[in-house]
Amino acid sequence: MADAFTVALTLLSARELSETQLRARLTRRKLDPDDIDTAIARLKQDGTLDDRRVARALARMESSIKHRGRTRVIQKVRQAGIDADVADEAVSEVFEDVDEHALLERALERRLRGKAPRDLDDRNRARIVRGLMAQGFRLEAILKKLQ
């Protein structure tokens, strides 16, 4: 049976993982908990495992590629098992370079499908607002754009 360090390196070679994600995957493989702790400590020491780097990469992907708002990006980063302070710091760092209003504008245009906001009935307006809020945009910003 492979040791925890080798398995961890194999998993990390496929994609970046947070410490929590890596620990869960190693545990599912029924590896010795002490070996898992040792492997994770070694990976953290040599910089192979870095939750800050994972948080920044995940925040960049969620904001730039998936066009999510700040709230949803923070939620996604925290779901990866990253500490709340590290997640908030990474998202703030990424959103320094992101125009949230442009993100919202683009998401709204996709949802409107060429219609003007004033042409929406109440049902469709509510549907669009719920969808944009689920993407992590603030209600105040959404309502302002819909006026």
PLM regions: where:
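An alpha-helical, amphipathic repeat domain used for nucleic-acid recognition
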Residues: 1-147
